[in-house]
Amino acid sequence: MAYPFQLGLQDATSPIMEELLHFHDHTLMIVFLISSLVLYIISLMLTTKLTHTSTMDAQEVETVWTILPAIILILIALPSLRILYMMDEINNPSLTVKTMGHQWYWSYEYTDYEDLNFDSYMIPTQELKPGELRLLEVDNRVVLPMEMTVRMLISSEDVLHSWRVPSLGLKTDAIPGRLNQTTLMAMRPGLYYGQYSEICGSNHSFMPIVLEMVPLSYFETWSAVMV
């Protein structure tokens, strides 16, 4: 869950988000080292008037600064490709939920059940209860079982939308006429908030997403009541 004036990323709740956090730290370390080296060289050039004539046309130096960037790019690309394949891999999901974007709300359908579907609207500010979050609460939360693989099928009824939950490392575009899919698996129970992340009109910022991850026994009870 995010908090005011937060500078870092949200705490990871899924294996994918854990991998993304590690990749972020890995890449940031490389960028920091390169930036420090460049700033050091620039400071030397500005504070000294010495010129190394032997390096002005050195074949060895040309070779080094051609090969070294290639190695650095490989060190960044390999873990990135691994995470991309992990995000696209879907093996025997335990549950499938179809998500449709509308102007300006989301609708959800649990395809493994005959009649389990609902719309999810943002709760207006004047109707919030004490302790609820402004512009983040919805009237119907998406209840899902924790520690189980859930497949989300995402599309749109009208314009481009985007379904995003930062704590789970999810962001999938909802495109009219196209069905995109992604998977999620939360490692612990709780409420996980997401916000709309596609400019599609005047009320695009009023389409929050709330996932309620619960134990399987609670989910079975909830689904029986909803059906």
Swiss-Prot record:
One of its GO terms (biological process) is ATP synthesis coupled electron transport. Mg(2+) binds at residue 198. It is found in: Mitochondrion inner membrane. Keywords: Copper, Electron transport, Magnesium, Membrane, Metal-binding, Mitochondrion, Mitochondrion inner membrane, Phosphoprotein, Respiratory chain, Translocase, Transmembrane, Transmembrane helix, Transport. One of its GO terms (molecular function) is cytochrome-c oxidase activity. NCBIfam families: CoxB. This is Cytochrome c oxidase subunit 2. It comes from Lycalopex gymnocercus. The gene is MT-CO2.
